[in-house]
Amino acid sequence: MILFVLGPQRSGTSAITRVLSLCGGTLPAGMLGADTNNPLGYWEPRAAITLNESILRRHGSNWYDPSLRLLEGDAFRPVEKADHIARIAAYLATLPVAPLVVIKEPRITTLSGLWFEAARLAGFDVATVIAVRQPQEAVKSIAKSWHVSPALASAIWLKYNLLAEQYTRGVTRVFVEYANLLDDWRREVKRISVTLPNELSTGEEQAVEDFLRPDLRRQRHTGPVADLFGTDWVSAVYEAFRAAAVDEPVDAPTLERVFESYRACERDFRMAFQDFHGLSNSMLFRVFPPVIAGPVMEILAMAHRRRGTWA
């Protein structure tokens, strides 16, 4: 079985993945190492990062793309989709032989359909953990790590959470809130374990305790959720995920409402901005800047003897 850890960057996915690997899960080889943004390691395979980024860029996207362009019907031609799935399956064939392999790479969230299909074709069962984090904490962490605006960070948070929920409908899944993991990791491991055919172990307790240091949570927010975009999208999604993280029923109607609203607005604004940039970069705008367009209009007015509509 492959247990995919899904969700936005800076939402506790690294901590969840490492804890799972210390409780009986097996990690792929070739991890992305620690850095100043993640001093205890990312616990995501370099090969998966390269593979996902190549797919995203081939289709005009990347990990920080807030759009849902890859959900559009013509995003993947059948031949392209088959090629992507084959490449993912080839990577999965290199995984260590183990009852439970844990894979975390945030871009997988946006490409879950391809990864899940490849995993099943390769003979793996699929289960998922969806990381949940208070949006202000995640947004501040994303903004600080990548030097982006809170608006883009919030859109990324929304997109990845919405896609994680959409793609895992009908798949074994557990919502795990980052704060809950830090508060009582044994409880959260047990919640995950009961959904899996092979029970997780807490035999490496000291290693987990040493890893889950209090300073791991560098962004803390205890106030109300700040909504952006003139909507309740952020707060509504967080409330639904937060409830699911304590085993309450998933609020599917609310999540579907937000998903469809985000999708419609994002698509329309994307088309509008594409047209804007297209016009701004058009030959007409390049050839006729105001210093030239003004005299040209005066010549046309003279040609019409400044009469009628040219008066």
Where in the sequence are the language-model features?
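PAPS-dependent sulfotransferases, especially Golgi type II membrane carbohydrate sulfotransferases
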Residues: 194, 198-311
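A structural motif corresponding to the C-terminal end of an alpha-helix
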Residues: 91-96, 163-174
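Glycine-rich phosphate-binding loop used to anchor ATP phosphates in small-molecule kinases
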Residues: 78-116, 120
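Lumenal/extracellular "mature" regions of secretory-pathway glycan-modifying transferases
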Residues: 144-156
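Conserved phosphate-donor/acceptor-positioning beta-strand/loop module used by diverse small-molecule
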Residues: 104-108, 122-142, 157, 176
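Short catalytic/ligand-binding loop motif for oxyanion handling, primarily in non-cytosolic enzymes
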Residues: 11-17, 109-112, 136-141, 182-186
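PAPS-dependent sulfotransferase catalytic core
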Residues: 1-84
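The conserved 3'-phosphoadenosine-5'-phosphosulfate
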Residues: 32-39, 130-135, 140, 169-239
